[in-house]
């Protein structure tokens, strides 16, 4: 018998061993994925639920200012927290522009390209622009000794907000404290908890201040430390205001004791601070305090308030063992083992150097005359 007849079985045997090794390697990779990723990392054996949350806040702090406009004045919570309550947020005023003793009447508009004039023909009666403080009367009157502007019917004198106080009016606001009370509920598991943990005593709660290292679960935060933890400078931010985010993460594994389900706090600045884009930076709004004089004339104090808005963002997911997701993931994992054969075939049919040997054994090619004989 010619020796060439013995070569093919030997080569096929070598191919079969390599195919078996590849097949086992693919199966081990799938097994590692199912056990390591699906069950251990992603906890595929658990049913999950999203958090339902409520938040209330309480700010404390007192400071004093002494200015030529207001004199010596005490500022407490009722003065600088506006409004007193918001949904999942709190605003603390840190800087302001006062326009005192405004009353409705006629006065010159602030000078700009659209309001400066030389005579009455430059002013249009009834004209109102986007940035107007009032309605033009059609008269051109002196704003000061060198400039004339169009007269308006408005709250007079009109506000001049071209110069923001620096440093911030309430510099001491960085020492104000905020108590954040957060109650959470996972309805699917009927599990509820709050961020004032059961281990806290009244004495501890009165004296603790949040610190990531020493007091990571204290729900009382110093405003300056919140800004600092987000990588910002409080005194700079206090001038024009900004929006901060206090994030509370409640990721809980309910297969463990309830004491392990605790909040994790993090901080970041939410409004974009870009040194290259200085148009309309920070956060501000206007409000007024109204008075009526004995003569019956209504007056007001207009305040343009700059400050830090703190948004409290609560998120989280809880998981607990359940038979249904466990069986679904086990079944999916077993089904993946069927992929091992397909992947193995792809490797040996298209990637290996001697792939034609495997193809010869996997597929049987029938000649035309053999096919005719079979059909006949």
Task: Tell where the protein language model's regions lie, with residue ranges.
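Membrane-proximal extracellular juxtamembrane segment immediately upstream
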Residues: 262-376
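Eukaryote-biased feature marking scaffold/signaling PDZ-domain proteins and nuclear chromatin regulators
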Residues: 9, 16, 20, 241, ...
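Membrane-anchoring signal-anchor transmembrane alpha-helices and their immediate flanking context
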Residues: 1-79, 331, 338-363, 367-376
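Eukaryotic intrinsically disordered and solvent-exposed regulatory patches
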Residues: 21, 234-236, 294-297
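Hydrophobic alpha-helical segments with strong N-terminal bias
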Residues: 7, 11, 26, 229, ...
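An acidic- and aromatic-residue-enriched active-site/binding cleft used to recognize and process polar
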Residues: 17, 255, 315
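Long, solvent-exposed, non-transmembrane segments immediately flanking or lying between transmembrane helices
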Residues: 28, 32, 36-268
